[in-house]
Amino acid sequence: MSGLVRTEPLPGETPLLVPGDPYSVVVLLQGYAEPEGVGDAVRADGSVTLVLPQAWGPASSHREPQPYEAKTALEEAARGPILVDTAGPWAREALLGALAGQGVAPGDVTLVVGTHGHSDHIGNLGLFPGAALLVSHDFCLPGGRYLPHGLGEERPLRLGPGLEVWATPGHGGQRDVSVLVAGTALGTVMVVGDVFERDGDEGSWQALSEDPVAQKHSRKRILGTADVVVPGHGAPFRVIREASAPETEPARSRDGEEPTVHG
């Protein structure tokens, strides 16, 4: 059965909370990209999203792992607040204020995921020296101990129940990643960096992509899985998949992706 994919803006202002069990998602800062002046100048910054374990409390991030807990290094790093992207260094105070508004101090963050290596997405890594880092495909523990992990397009990284990191190449090359959070009040939320710049970007994302073929595939995978997408430079949006009647010819979207209608 074929189907149409429709997207529509998710109402609400930042910080935007999507409660869930065992993880909630909080969009702390909404990214933007706006032309400025003449020529091709753009003022931009990336979205910042917090993933909070339901059982987290300020003391729990610093507890010692129990002997019976068989966890990977990544799963242990995800025991506390997880930050997905950090915006640019010019957003330092806004980021600290947004975290404080959720009762989270920089030292509480146990894992920072950088979706890709652009300055408007990982410009504040220095605020979190005590956190493990997963930037693109590089995973390191505090102090610079790098560990292998095996992430691939057909092999997501499991951080916890319903919490995964996906390889979603394209925009920044072959090493972009996205974070999937299942079990929220709105279904599956995916924080995707610049795989989607914003809702309704079909006519513009290709010009910013290092590998449009790979990114097109990543976008299709995300649209086939997510109920809510947090893009890199715009407001979160819902993804609504609708079954369609049998057709003599397949529906086509404007850019050849999963057929999409924007609400």
Curated annotation (Swiss-Prot):
Reactions that this protein is recorded to catalyse: a ribonucleotidyl-ribonucleotide-RNA + H2O = a 3'-end ribonucleotide-RNA + a 5'-end 5'-phospho-ribonucleoside-RNA + H(+)
Region (Disordered), start-end ranges: 242-263
Localization in the cell: Cytoplasm, Cytosol; Nucleus
Binding positions (Zn(2+) 2): 120-121, 194, 233
BP GO annotations: histone mRNA metabolic process; positive regulation of G1/S transition of mitotic cell cycle
Pfam family of the protein (one): Lactamase_B
Keyword Transport: no
Residues noted as binding Zn(2+) 1 in the record, renumbered to the chain: 116, 118, 171, 194
Disulfide bonds, paired cysteine numbers: none
Cofactor: record remark: Binds 2 Zn(2+) ions per subunit.
One GO MF term attached to the UniProt entry: metal ion binding
The protein's enzyme class: hydrolase
Composition skew (Basic and acidic residues), residue ranges: 249-263
Cofactor: Zn(2+)
UniProt comment concerning the protein's domains: Contains four of the five characteristic MBL-fold metal-binding motifs, with two waters completing metal coordination.
Function, as annotated: Endoribonuclease that catalyzes the hydrolysis of histone-coding pre-mRNA 3'-end. Involved in histone pre-mRNA processing during the S-phase of the cell cycle, which is required for entering/progressing through S-phase. Cleaves histone pre-mRNA at a major and a minor cleavage site after the 5'-ACCCA-3' and the 5'-ACCCACA-3' sequence, respectively, and located downstream of the stem-loop. May require the presence of the HDE element located at the histone pre-RNA 3'-end to avoid non-specific cleavage.
Subunit structure: Homodimer.
Name used for this protein in its record: Metallo-beta-lactamase domain-containing protein 1
Origin species: Bos taurus
